[in-house]
Regions:
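An acidic site on a long C-lobe helix of protein kinase domains
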Residues: 49-52, 65-68, 129, 141-147, ...
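Membrane-penetrating hydrophobic segments
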Residues: 1-9
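Cytosolic-biased juxtamembrane loops and peripheral soluble domains of multi-pass membrane proteins
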Residues: 30-48, 89-92, 116-136, 162-172, ...
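Cytosol-/stroma-facing membrane-proximal "stalk/adaptor" domains immediately downstream
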Residues: 175-241
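A short, structured surface patch at a secondary-structure boundary
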Residues: 125-183, 223-226
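A hydrophobic, helix-centered structural microdomain
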Residues: 8-115, 222-270
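Feature marks short, surface-exposed loop/turn motifs that line or immediately flank catalytic pockets
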Residues: 114-117, 155
């Protein structure tokens, strides 16, 4: 029993150290960006002083505790994927107050699709590369466990708007870019209100609502509901069922429900 308590003590110390480093880093960022124009101002003590340290405390602790599971998934992934078990992709992060542009970071997940190719060397369609192992990974959300590293690095938060593809950035209205004024999240308000079953407009509305109302009680509720939804496997839609955001947005442009951003017109000449 004393060995178990000692291990718990070590985990808490390491998690606390990570939390302190995060707090100091946030204060240094405030000094560095003093005078810069922010799209989003932190509301209250929680968002400004507590949220980021808590992210690091729980993410570091969780990473240590589940390390045996990660090692197992890495081993199985190497076998099932016939190589690299990880999938990384550029995603837009929080807007840099000095440049006014989203910081691009590398999101890391467990690979859920194989790299199988046809006779011409082209990747097979997603539905053919998504095997039963990958489907189970996605359904259980185990593929997202490596994202704890992104949280510790400061790319993301435990709770926040989910980071979409970089290619979608040109399709946001100026108001919708506000979703990137905070760190993206491992889970978010949209994920517990329909997960991938919600359409793109609903997801955007949930994200914007979250950005304007960041509170500890709401974050705790979102985490609880996320865990609950993962275990009951609710609101899960297979990849591709909702289509891509760019196609969805072009449809809205065509019917006039959403104006075409001036930046997109200047960039593409549309």
């Amino acid at each position: 029993m004393k060995y178990v308590l000692k291990i718990i003590e070590i985990i808490i110390v390491l998690a606390a150290f990570s939390s302190v480093l995060a707090f100091v880093s946030e204060r240094l960022d405030e000094i560095k960006n003093r005078g810069a124009k922010f799209l989003h101002k932190s509301h209250g003590i929680y968002e400004r002083f507590i949220k980021r340290p808590l992210d690091c405390f729980f993410s570091t602790g969780a990473l240590i505790i589940i390390s045996p599971i990660l090692i197992l998934l890495i081993t199985v992934g190497v076998i099932k994927m016939k190589g690299n078990p990880f999938f990384t992709q550029d995603r837009p992060g929080r807007i840099d107050p000095k440049t006014g542009r989203e910081r691009i970071f590398r999101l890391i997940k467990f690979r859920s699709m194989t790299n199988e190719k046809d006779a011409d060397g082209n990747l097979l369609p997603d539905e053919q590369r998504l095997k039963s192992y990958g489907k189970r990974l996605r359904a259980s959300s185990l593929d997202e466990l490596p994202e704890l590293l992104n949280i510790i690095k400061g790319d993301t938060s435990i709770v926040g708007p989910r980071p979409w593809a970089v290619s979608y950035l040109d399709y946001f209205t100026p108001e919708e870019h506000q979703r990137h004024s905070v760190r993206p999240g491992l889970t978010g308000l949209a994920q517990v209100n329909g997960r991938t079953a919600a359409n793109w407009t609903e997801r955007l509305n949930y994200d914007m609502s979250y950005v304007d109302n960041i509170r500890f009680a709401d974050d705790a509720k979102i985490v609880f509901l996320t865990v609950k939804k993962v275990f009951v496997k609710s609101d899960i839609v297979e990849a591709g069922c909702q289509g891509n955001f760019d196609d969805y947005r072009r449809t809205q442009w065509a019917d006039g429900s959403v104006p075409i951003p001036e930046k997109f017109v200047q960039k593409t000449g549309v």
